[in-house]
């Protein structure tokens, strides 16, 4: 959340609910009765990310209050694909004349500038997180409550995804992992 504030690109917050059972909660669904697609804030952010070079942060708050493997399964698989052009989710089975520009044959490409951040708790109201999720995540454990401190006022700075990606590539070249 704060990283989005610092980068001048607000994060999209998705408060995970215990009833989440499938991808519809994140990406929306086509309503056969109304013949309209019910979109979510997460889907809107993914779509809009294709039009900018910002770091687009999506926060899944309390993501293990429902089973991550159920509602985030498709995204876990997509993010493992080495070819970023294959990072697609099927939103509808076919295309229509008035489909949004970035929707091709019912599919939406997930831009690389979308970052998912999840918070998880470890208590009796949550589900354990499977190895499938842990294997695809960068985990930061906070085992105790932090000590309050005053941070210096820091001016926000627009940092593009391209800039961050360039810094990553430079760091990988300068400090190779053996």
Please report, for each region that a protein language model flagged, where it lies by residue.
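AAA+ P-loop NTPase catalytic core and its hallmark functional loops
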Residues: 1-165
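Amphipathic alpha-helical segments of the small helical/lid subdomains adjacent to P-loop NTPase cores
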Residues: 166-170
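Basic, amphipathic alpha-helical bundle interface domains used for macromolecular binding and assembly
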Residues: 171-178
């Amino acid at each position: 959340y704060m990283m989005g504030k610092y980068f001048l690109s607000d994060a999209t917050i998705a408060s995970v609910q215990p009833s989440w059972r499938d991808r519809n909660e994140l990406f929306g669904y086509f309503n056969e009765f109304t013949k309209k697609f019910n979109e979510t804030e997460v889907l809107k952010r993914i779509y809009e990310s294709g039009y900018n070079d910002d770091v687009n942060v999506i926060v899944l708050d309390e993501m293990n209050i429902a089973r991550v493997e159920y509602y985030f399964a498709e995204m876990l698989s997509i993010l493992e694909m080495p070819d970023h052009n294959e990072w697609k989710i099927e939103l509808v089975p076919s295309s229509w004349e008035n489909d949004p520009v970035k929707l091709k044959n019912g599919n939406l490409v997930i831009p690389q500038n979308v970052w998912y951040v999840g918070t998880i708790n470890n208590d009796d109201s949550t589900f354990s997180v499977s190895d499938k999720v842990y294997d695809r995540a960068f985990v930061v454990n906070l085992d105790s409550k932090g000590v309050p401190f005053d941070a210096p006022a820091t001016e926000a700075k627009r940092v593009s995804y391209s800039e961050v990606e360039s810094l990553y590539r430079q760091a990988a070249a300068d400090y190779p992992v053996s």
